[in-house]
Amino acid sequence: MKRLILFLSFCVAFLSMFADSWVRINQLGYIPKTSKVAVYLSEEATEVSSFQLVDVFTGKEVYTSKAVKPMGALGGMKATYRLNFSDFTRQGTYRIVVNGCESPIFPINGHVYDGTADFVLNYMRQQRCGFNPFLRDSCHQKDAFIRYHATKEGQHIDVRGGWHDAADLLQYTTTSANAIYQMLFAYQQNPDAFTDSFQANGLPGANGIPDIVDEIYWGLDWLDRMNPEKGELYNQIADDRDHIGQKLPQTDPSDYGRGPNNGRPVYFIDGKPQQRGTYMNATMGAASTAGKFASDFALGAEVLKPFYPQFSQKISSKAADALQVGIDKPGNTQTVSVVSPYIYEEDNWVDDMELGSVELFRMTGDGKYLTKAVEYGRREPVTPWMGADSARHYQWYPFMNMGHYQIAAHTTDARLKAEFLRNMRAGIARTYERGQAHPFLWGIPGIWCSNNLTTAMLTQCILYRTLSGDDSFEEMEGSLRDWLFGCNPWGTSMIVELPKGGTYPRATHSNWVFQNLGHPVGGLVDGPVYSTIFSSLRGVNITDDMPHVTANAYLRFQPGDVVYHDNTHDYSTNEPTMDGTASLTFPLSYYQKEGRAQTGAASADKNVYDEGGIKQGDPSKKNICLVFTSHDKTDGANYIISTLKKRNVKGAFFFTGHFFESFPDIVKRIQAGGHYVGSHSYGHLQYAAWENRDSLLVTKDEFTTDMLKGYEVMLKFGITKEQAPYFIPPYEYYNSTISSWAKELGLQIVNFTPGTASNEDYTWHGMPMEAEKYRSSQWLYDNMMKWEKKHTLNGHFLMIHLGTDDARTDKFYLKLDKIITTLQKKGYNFVSLEDMIGLNLK
């Protein structure tokens, strides 16, 4: 007996050695005033009574809480706990500590969502058909020949454009129209969240139109082509004969009976069943698609009017006709397949007609459309998947009914508003009840594209809360949001490269990955599915994968009922989709707006970014910010400090840890002058290779350790991270990964504005690097003035080194006084760093 006890004790001790625990968080971080709940997972039956927040920059414990809720076992995790720190609102950078287990680092500030809604548009551009800016090539130029039309069978119609649906190259009005509406709504509600960095064709370069509007127009132009005449609506381009392996769109070898890459079919909506493999689909009418046409044309006309007035008028005139098709042919329209039984099995349609009707009411003011919208809305008060355990693929689509919100938001009848708010609340409540026992409050059924359902419910929660003022479901809203960014069993973001410095899907089911061309950046992957669904699908596996991809990296964390795999051949959980990605634009832009409002920042970020770093302030304002950097040179300090004082100009100084330690008197003089003093790293590390900016030369741990060490030194001068959240990287050289790591620390990279070449004041004759070319001070000054005359210096960060090598005897900083006075005469204002940037990271 003693031997048995000793043996069992040894086994327990042995297992404990390999047991582990984790804290799951939102990797982006949190805005200050929002629901903030982390989840603790342990392979041991651990008791948790409290947890702490530790300030990463000071190492001090700043918060202790007993707001701990045990949630039981989950898969291989014997204990899970919800750790609620919603009442902690102080901006900063933290980690959670619970039972000796530490979470990853995360920030709390008003800017964690800045730029994220724009970021997901990268995937939409990658999915473009007709001309693909990612490939810089055209594709599918022969689309398409007509099917199922009584008099036009086989005829050609120009339906080029739009987006490929996912890794396959099919195009569906069902998903594309929903994607268009989601982006329209996001821009209508939160226009300041979107910027202009790309042309209308998707290639880099501003065109004076917000990028999301470019994307909306790309989609609506295609949708307009899919409705060439009154009553003539098309539902789909291509079919599952496309599914012949991974391929590139410009050389698509799919054969639809006319030879490879020689045109694809486009399917007319006749309101009758069409092919589904060896069977027929369950189409009963045209209304589900017709309603989508109508809502897109109506809202699209409003949004596009300032940018494309003629096109706006054109689609405005089509909206009522499209809705009439749905009135004449009530019922659902499903998609077509030829080889397999897999289709979009949309069964509902009154939601689409409700939204189409209410948008026509908004466009025309005609009350008959509101009456119709209410009639349709009452036929489906709650989208049926909400609270259910299962549903067929896209059976209840779109996954949330925007019509309910639009009626409640725009009716003047208080009773009607209350009715449709109750409808919204009922769907949320059902999902909430289903998720109550789940450690992550995830009440979403584990069906195909569960992340799309998660995003839809998140959107409904936001809209209900903001319109009703009822915050009863705010914790679930936060859990759904955080699920998408890593507060889930697997600890991964569900959006490719967001955040880039974090954990996100890397082995996605994507043509770009299979062809080694890149990643579907910004794409929202399908998300977890029931284990039974995964096991039943054809061709899906996690073993026949690409080199260097682990077969089941998340095996340890699989909850059991559902699975998620970061594997290229798992198209059920790891394939990005176009409609799901577009649906992110509203919640992400909303949280950006909410975060900025909470911290008093300007609603619109007018700064210009490069690889995540700010390289220019607002280009419309005649403001200039002087920035100075140094690692070990100080010969210009006296002149620069005295000149700034004489001219009453505030500059921004960025020093390495070595500089702070070596030249404390200079630092103190600069501080006394009221200038910004920030970090230039501690050890002046080179982050990326000169020959390849994407090639990192430091690890995340090395970067973080170096930055924290630098701020530790700065703290001796009374400079906290909150006082100095902006830093210039060593060598003024970085990439988007470094920017992401910095943002995780609550820091924002700033860099000089290219063009003037003032940063080249460190060069000297005979430099050892042949690539470096000596620039005299006169040349630098003249070039600056030429650049100003041609381009202006609006929003420029003009950089001058605090000192240079002794080999350079011609010191450019000696022209500082002349630069200031000359540019002031030209009407420029020299402003502080904080005033230039306009963010509030403190």
Model region roles, listed by residue range:
Residues T175, I180-Y187, L223-R225, Y234-N235, ...:
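Structural recognition of the beta-strand scaffold that forms the well-ordered cores
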Residues I212-I237:
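Carboxylate/His-rich catalytic cores and anion/metal-binding grooves
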Residues M1-D20:
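Bacterial Sec-dependent N-terminal signal peptides
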Residues N201-I209:
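Acidic, glycine-anchored loop motifs typical of Ca2+
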